[in-house]
Amino acid sequence: SARRAFPCWDEPSYKATYSFRMLHSENTTALANMPSVRRRTARADDMQRLLHASPDLRGAWLMTEFDTTPRMSTYLVAWANGAFQHVSNTAASPLTGRKIPVSLYTTPEFIQQAAYTTDVMARVLAMYEKVFRIAYPLPKLDALVSADFDFGAMENWGLITGRTSVFLHDETMGLRGQKNAASVMSHEIARMWFGDIATMAWWDNLWLNE
């Protein structure tokens, strides 16, 4: 529930813009719907102001600030932090010619399985632009894959999240595993248009996303 994170009307028909700053350890990666625009070493007064305390934190800490989102529903807002590694690719927009960076983040033990799905992300994003004739509006598309994610997948705008079991692929999984990873990722990317750009007024029209 977004209400547990920040004051909001947590209903799909209400849209707003969001700006985030994240305080995190320097050996971790901070992610959100939009790309980071500034990153600097955190000062003691940053920590005191944001945490409302004077914590005795060991090691170096960073303050990462993210670009402001377009107007979007609260259920699509996402941010994450952890010891992630990533594989990147580029989608070439057939409508604008823009080069859109796509990246898949996961924990180090799964990073060798990320290349195939990252390639799918780049190909499918460009294909959907051509099919829907609407350009993907965000500066980037990331996916964060975790072994303990509660759901199969979630179409957060610009930061798709999901389980390793449905998003990652290696040669031991065979053709069925390859097709499943491509199918689930393609489904989630389609939701960048059907659900994220065009959003249902209420949950009884969830068929729009599916």
Where does each model-flagged region fall?
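Hydrophobic helix-coil surface modules that form long, contiguous segments used
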Residues: 2, 7-186, 203, 210
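Catalytic Zn2+-binding segment of zinc metalloproteases
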Residues: 189-205
